[in-house]
């Protein structure tokens, strides 16, 4: 059977192992062909091809539910659930999403882009099933990296307390999340992964399953036949943690052996209780370059399939903001041993990998644990250290309570660097960094800032570290503007001080962060129409530079704000509140992201759809204020 002929996963039923292995090869071929052309997540999907095929042969997906954690692993799922022909449009505007999305397919039972949610969602579905008196199966597939997340452990703790609630958790253990996983649980899984194979069940488990009506007497024999794959369920140090938490543990299982996977999953479904199936896979399986560099090939831009090398862009790009941040922080750390860089499983993405390589004593990776990262930093700051927490804007949302309770209320000197702030592109609504201005502006004691270019990033970073209170510095995804940076001697900024970039009397444009460059381009368009704009680089949204902004606004009387974030509670709202509090009655036109979810597309396509390109903004300003050309 050909993969292209699959329109429904139930078509896998009845296929031989040999046929499934043939489809596995086709999935990898299609996966590699598309990702090498347009970019996307590579290693995770390649590692779960056999797991996906085996699992789906044991399920009826017209009824049964499967929740994939994060969605990095979801490409094989998409290819066998009717999206083969559309797969060329992966992560492109109006195309197939890079993550599972309920609105895209009835087989995407739960959407996700953030880690550690799958067990909670699948357990919720299982509880709903039991309350309705139905009998469909509920399965969560979670990676070993995501399993370190607190939410996943909370769900395991809850599920284990419900012994009569059938739930299968498949642990896809490839010893790798995005970066190598960290922590005691990861170390424990390493020990389990290399433990000697045992081919029999514990007496206690055999006795318990024999009591299951009708089928119980057959299960132990069926499990015994999974030769060389299932290791003893209750031997100390092999699955003991999960069994103590109320799960029946099965594994470790070879994750690329379809026949044994099918037997194991069928046996797990029959147990009718919480079961954890530990499957050991190889991230990037089937593509040697991805197997050899599992971090680098987690996600890739377009690359040459033959050499594995990225296809260089036609025009060289400036260094990314993330790298400038990492390089600058390294220099600061070398000068001050009290400065500590903290990341939550995103060392490479945030630029902190340079600390990991050069000064590991001043680098901490807490794993997928944003809440812990924030409060860890709070505790460190109490005793004289200077923590710098680098987290994607979208992931810091997960630690909102800690920002308030553990940092803001106590006014602790913790520096937060929010990477991927603003529009991020192809990862879609789960990853857009559009909310941080709004949610952080409400927290007392915080200073919020955003640079217009690389040089300001360096100055703001040293300002943050020197400030005796909490700060948040947002930086956009991707390349900088090509502005020269310094290796040392960065001049701290005055907190709350804005700057005038261009003088003008017809319109006042106050821009924040990444939108400053767009404001300058917009002003050029307006100037060609004989409209002279005064441009202010706000630098800070909290506190605002009242002494600069209010006199300018009072004089010019027409104000435009620009931000790459949600308008609700954002930078523009702060300006409106400033004027209202000071009884200044001046019209303010706010330009930013309206109350919508920003779908997957390139950043420029998203900005065009939102009306955030310079020519669009110039046109909006002219129409809003009825400016005479």
Curated annotation (Swiss-Prot):
Under Gene Ontology molecular function, one entry of this record is: thiamine pyrophosphate binding
* Record Gene3D superfamilies: 3.40.50.920, 3.40.50.970
Q: Which residues bind thiamine diphosphate?
A: 72, 113-115, 145-146, 174, 287, 370
List the EC numbers from the record: 2.2.1.7
User: What does UniProt give as GO cellular component?
Assistant: cytosol
From the UniProt record, give the pathway where this protein acts: Metabolic intermediate biosynthesis; 1-deoxy-D-xylulose 5-phosphate biosynthesis; 1-deoxy-D-xylulose 5-phosphate from D-glyceraldehyde 3-phosphate and pyruvate: step 1/1
Disulfide bond annotation, renumbered to this chain? none
Please name the PROSITE patterns in this protein's record: TRANSKETOLASE_1, TRANSKETOLASE_2
Which CDD domains does this UniProt record tie to the protein? TPP_DXS, TPP_PYR_DXS_TK_like
Q: Which residues bind Mg(2+)?
A: 144, 174
Which enzyme class? Answer: transferase
Record key words, sorted: Isoprene biosynthesis, Magnesium, Metal-binding, Thiamine biosynthesis, Thiamine pyrophosphate, Transferase
Q: Which SUPFAM superfamilies match?
A: Thiamin diphosphate-binding fold (THDP-binding), TK C-terminal domain-like
Q: How is the cofactor bound?
A: Binds 1 Mg(2+) ion per subunit. Binds 1 thiamine pyrophosphate per subunit.
Question: GO:BP terms for this protein?
Answer: 1-deoxy-D-xylulose 5-phosphate biosynthetic process; isopentenyl diphosphate biosynthetic process, methylerythritol 4-phosphate pathway; terpenoid biosynthetic process; thiamine biosynthetic process
Q: Does the keyword Hydrolase apply?
A: no
A Pfam family assignment: Transket_pyr
| Needed cofactors | Mg(2+); thiamine diphosphate
The reaction(s) this protein catalyses: D-glyceraldehyde 3-phosphate + pyruvate + H(+) = 1-deoxy-D-xylulose 5-phosphate + CO2
Which HAMAP family does the entry mention? DXP_synth
**Assembly and binders:** Homodimer.
Query: What job does this protein perform?
Result: Catalyzes the acyloin condensation reaction between C atoms 2 and 3 of pyruvate and glyceraldehyde 3-phosphate to yield 1-deoxy-D-xylulose-5-phosphate (DXP).
Q: Which family does it belong to?
A: Belongs to the transketolase family. DXPS subfamily.
Can you say what this protein is called? Answer: 1-deoxy-D-xylulose-5-phosphate synthase
Q: Give the originating organism.
A: Prochlorococcus marinus (strain AS9601)
